[in-house]
Structures are given as C-alpha cells and as structure tokens.
C-alpha cells in the first residue's frame, strides 16, 4: 500500500 501525499499539492 502506497500513500503519496505529493499528489495533494
């Protein structure tokens, strides 16, 4: 499982 919060910016 990979959560990339970079996508939120």
From Swiss-Prot:
Induction: By elevated hydrostatic pressure. On the 2D-gel the determined MW of this unknown protein is: 65 kDa. This is Unknown protein 9 from 2D-PAGE.
């Amino acid at each position: 499982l990979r959560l990339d919060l970079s996508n939120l910016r």
